[in-house]
A protein has these predicted regions:
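C-terminal subdomain of the subtilisin-like protease fold in secreted/lumenal serine endopeptidases
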Residues: 348-355, 363, 405, 519-609, ...
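Extracellular S/T/G-rich loop segment that most often corresponds to the catalytic His/Ser-adjacent loop
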Residues: 421-519
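Inhibitory N-terminal propeptides of secreted protease zymogens
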Residues: 25-158
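Substrate-binding/access-modulating region of protease and related hydrolase catalytic domains
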Residues: 18-22, 213, 217-219, 228, ...
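A short beta-strand micro-motif common to beta-rich folds, especially ectodomain repeats
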Residues: 648-661, 666-668
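Protease zymogen maturation seam
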Residues: 99-112, 126-222, 230-236, 240, ...
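Bacterial Sec-dependent N-terminal signal peptides
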Residues: 13-39, 674-679
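Subtilisin-like serine protease catalytic core
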Residues: 205-333, 346, 356-360, 403-404, ...
Length: 679
């Protein structure tokens, strides 16, 4: 339930200013609607200040060393005095390497205020909303899982998994012994869980068969898994885990200056520490399961396969763990926003998000609390979340890399609802619905016009036998959970494998396909904007509306005796499940799309040098490099690596000639204070 509080702002207040050259905007005298969602944290308000306040705020933060008790703005501080504020700090810590774009995006103007929890939050919002210097207000609150934390997945130990061998008719491309359970990658129509009522159709999968002949991954593509912690030491994941070189666990210092201590494998935004945890009471292994679908190590002779996990002589994509849930606890909205920015600033180009608010059309009788109904309502309720997402979408990647901007991929939700949840439904995100192994919508999946893509997510309510356990023995004499998604898992700190279902499982299929596509684009020397790549994922996906005919029968709470059958009218889902993401079709579409990669311009300081691998930009072997003015800089090529050595300030041109005579050009700028970045 949401509360809407209408406030008529007071007349302009007489306000002093610490700097006579900085004017404070007049307060808005039009009626203002302040929205405080249920579950808002007492004693905390998140404020975005007007741009005119930048100098005052910077001065306050400089004096305080990063955390203060007051803003330095007299009118704001009068209210903070009344509220008993004891903490005033930037939402986003300073990362010197990315501070310029942080300011360009306006994220440096977001602050979190902590005050006496006994103060009425509504009155705090009323007081602050009247201030002309306040641009936006938002509550803080813990984020919620969109999946059931009490689910009990069937668990298979590593030892048991490695004892299995595939005998299925399909010729699998990798030697991972459990790959035969992963119908979601290559579905040949022979899965053992098919029944007369609930069938299996060949091709209802992620399209990996064709894709894996073209590409298996690339270690320079980084996927940020925003979820429970990923078990970075899992035997089937450890070789594909992102490592922040230079940082060490338990060192107690920020070695790379990015504002985060000990973040070697990612960061725990629940406990604000670089030590991520998958053993806390209430941990479900959800993040580890998601990560395995994207990048479990392929062809390593153990466990399962990942869509972009490498193999055939190639390394897989890298998984960055962004911990939003830790046991029974979750991070706040402020920390969630930090997490999104952290992912962009540390090299991730895909946000994998199997969580979100409940759909606005979810049924309250079933225990769901409906979330935002429109993009405008979501943006008004959670403006910080939207701006952090926009930052990732706009600033992740590189204009000189395979993608400029990032892809934010979200599960549509599991509330059986006729609208996607937010943030998935945001028009710049990719909302993912779930299908069963016969192309039909999964019984639980949210759907609607906001959904862009769908992927296998399992459907136990469809394939399960009413009144019986989902755990059955397959043709190998091994326990199998009917029609669910099999991946890496950790339970009670023990690495293994297991089954889950949900749009949470469909989502990483799309993230894995996106990662594989970017790996192939790099292989083909293609460059895309995030918007272009998002559109290509959609147009290359398969239209499956023709399968939505007649009715589908499923049993909610089907393991209980006397479960009631429920009928789905499949025609209701036409045009509302998106298109079926297809790895093979995407890779083929990448050929000839986007634009050629080209040599980036370079800016560096005098008496420094930098280098890059020419194979990332030029398809032919380079023969030599020439700099027009050798007094400014020189260039050499050795083993395909171009090295630029700066001498004195100035600007000059660089040409790289291939063995066939083709020339590639770039500009070299040498100036004091440059950070040696490719532009």
């Amino acid at each position: 339930m949401r509360r809407y509080i209408t406030i008529v702002a007071a007349a302009a207040l007489a306000m002093g200013c610490v700097n006579e050259n900085i004017s404070i905007p007049s307060p808005d005298t039009t009626p203002t609607t302040v929205v405080i969602p249920e579950g808002a944290t007492a004693g905390e308000v998140i404020i975005k200040f007007a741009p005119e306040m930048e100098a005052i705020l910077d001065q306050t933060m400089t004096r305080s060393g990063g955390e203060a008790t007051r803003s330095g703005i007299p009118s704001t501080d009068e209210v903070l005095d009344i509220l008993g504020a004891y903490s005033f700090e930037r939402v986003f810590p300073i990362d010197s390497a990315n501070e310029a774009r942080t300011r360009e995006a306006g994220l440096h103007l977001w602050y979190i205020v902590r005050f006496d929890e006994g103060e009425d939050l509504q009155q705090a919002f009323e007081r602050l909303s009247k201030l002309g210097e306040v641009d936006k207000l938002q509550c803080n609150r813990p984020i919620a899982r969109a999946y059931n934390p009490n689910a009990n997945p069937m668990f298979v130990s590593c030892a048991e998994a490695d004892s299995h061998a595939a005998t299925r008719a399909t010729a699998w491309p990798f030697n991972d012994p459990e790959i035969y359970r992963q119908w979601c990658y290559i579905n040949d129509g022979t899965a053992p869980f098919a029944t007369e009522r609930a069938g299996v159709l060949a091709g209802a999968d992620a399209g990996c068969a064709e894709a894996w002949d073209m590409c298996t991954g690339d270690e320079e593509i980084i996927v940020a898994v925003m979820d429970e912690a990923v078990m970075w030491s899992h035997p089937d994941l450890k070789d594909n885990i992102w490592v922040n070189e230079g940082e060490e666990l338990y060192a107690g210092k920020d070695a790379d200056g990015n504002g985060y201590i000990d973040d070697r494998y990612g960061y725990n935004f629940v406990r604000d520490t670089g030590i991520t945890s998958w053993t806390s009471n209430g941990s479900t292994g959800h993040g580890t399961h998601v990560a395995g679908t994207i990048a479990a190590v392929n062809d390593n002779g153990i466990g399962v396969a990942g869509i972009a996990g490498g193999g055939k002589g190639k390394r897989g994509v890298k998984i960055m763990t962004i911990q939003l849930f830790d046991g029974m606890n979750s991070c706040s909205l402020a920390m969630e926003a930090r997490a999104m920015k952290y992912a962009a600033d540390n090299g991730a180009v895909i946000l994998q998000c199997s969580w979100g608010y409940h759909s606005s059309k979810s049924n309250m009788i079933m225990g769901y609390i409906p979330g935002p109904a429109t993009e405008e309502e979501w943006a008004a309720l959670y403006p910080l979340e939207k701006e952090a997402l926009d930052y990732f979408i706009n600033y992740a990647g590189s204009p000189n890399g395979v993608i400029e901007g990032g892809l934010a991929i979200f599960a549509s939700g599991n509330e059986y609802a006729a609208q996607s949840s937010f943030p998935a439904a945001y028009s710049k995100c990719i909302s993912v619905a779930a299908i069963a192994a016969d192309y039909t919508p999964a019984s639980y999946s949210n759907y609607g016009s906001e959904v862009l893509l769908c992927a296998p997510g399992g459907d136990l309510e469809y394939y399960g036998t009413p009144g019986m356990s989902d755990n059955i023995y397959d043709e190998h004499g091994v326990l199998n959970q009917q029609g669910a998604i099999y991946s890496t898992l950790v339970i009670d700190g023990v690495a293994g494998y297991g089954y889950y279902e949900g749009t949470s499982m469909a989502c990483p299929h799309v993230s894995g396909i996106a990662a594989l596509g970017l790996a192939y684009a790099k292989q083909q020397h293609r460059h895309f904007t995030s918007e272009e790549f998002r559109e290509l994922m959609y147009t290359s996906a398969r239209d499956i509306d023709d399968y939505f005919v007649g009715e589908k029968l499923y049993y909610m709470r089907h393991e209980s005796a006397g479960a009631t059958p429920i009928k789905m009218n499949l025609a209701d889902y036409r045009g509302k499940m998106g298109r079926l993401a297809d790895a093979g079709a995407l890779l083929k579409a990448i050929e000839g799309s986007g634009r050629d990669m080209r040599l980036p311009n370079i800016c560096l300081a005098p008496n420094t040098l930098t280098s890059l691998n020419l194979a990332d930009y030029i398809t032919e072997e380079a023969a030599n490099a020439e700099v027009a003015n050798s007094e400014i800089a020189t260039a050499t090529i050795e083993a395909g690596v171009l090295t630029i050595s700066a001498k004195s300030e100035g600007q000059t041109s660089l040409s790289v000639t291939t063995k066939s005579g083709t020339k590639h050009y770039a500009t070299i700028t040498v100036r004091a204070g440059a950070d040696n970045g490719w532009l």
